[in-house]
């Protein structure tokens, strides 16, 4: 993947300003509420039987934060994202059996949460760079499935 200077700077800027403890939980809770079939991967997280339960679930929130910190690896290794996520792809494919389309659903929800946080600063150009980054990560995570 070729990155422009603008794309690199934009991705690094977004993640440097991101409140992981807010954005991560908001992203994962949005994902499992909007796409309830994704809840099957989180059955061990306790009560997730209603929107209120999901919103108050500490394990969902914690995992959302973990996911964002996982994206940090991609930000730090933008020139080698495929290899950066090779082991995580294998884990999600072979052990956790996560449908790879769920990575795209999560990235869409992350885009919505980030756009809401950034407001008018989330221009079309910023969105394009952000979604390009997420697309590369999603493709890398789904690589083991092919």
From Swiss-Prot:
SUPFAM superfamilies: Globin-like (SSF46458). Keywords: Disulfide bond, Heme, Iron, Metal-binding, Oxygen transport, Transport. One of its GO terms (biological process) is hydrogen peroxide catabolic process. Red blood cells. InterPro entries: Globin, Globin-like_sf, Globin/Proto, Hemoglobin_b, Hemoglobin_oxygen_transport. The keyword Transport applies. One of its GO terms (molecular function) is peroxidase activity. Transmembrane segments: none annotated. Residues 2-146 form the Globin domain. CDD domains: Hb-beta-like (cd08925). Heme b binds at residues 63, 92. GO terms for cellular component: blood microparticle; haptoglobin-hemoglobin complex; hemoglobin complex. Belongs to the globin family. Involved in oxygen transport from gills to the various peripheral tissues. Displays a strong alkaline Bohr effect, and at low pH exhibits the reduced ligand affinity and cooperativity that comprise the Root effect. Heterotetramer of two alpha chains and two beta chains. Can form polymers. This is Hemoglobin subunit beta. The gene is hbb.
């Amino acid at each position: 993947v070729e990155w422009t200077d603008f794309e690199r700077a934009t991705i690094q800027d977004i993640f440097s300003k991101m409140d992981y403890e807010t954005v991560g939980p908001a992203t994962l809770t949005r994902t499992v509420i909007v796409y309830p079939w994704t809840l099957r991967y989180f059955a061990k997280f306790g009560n997730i039987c209603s929107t209120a339960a999901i919103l108050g679930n500490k394990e969902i929130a914690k995992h959302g934060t973990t996911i964002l910190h996982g994206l940090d690896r991609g930000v730090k290794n933008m020139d080698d994202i495929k290899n950066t996520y090779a082991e995580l792809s294998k884990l999600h494919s072979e052990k956790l059996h996560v449908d790879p389309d769920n990575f795209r659903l999560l990235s869409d929800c992350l885009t919505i949460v980030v756009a809401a946080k950034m407001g008018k600063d989330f221009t079309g150009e910023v969105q394009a760079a952000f979604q390009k980054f997420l697309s590369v990560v999603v493709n890398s995570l789904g690589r083991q499935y092919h």
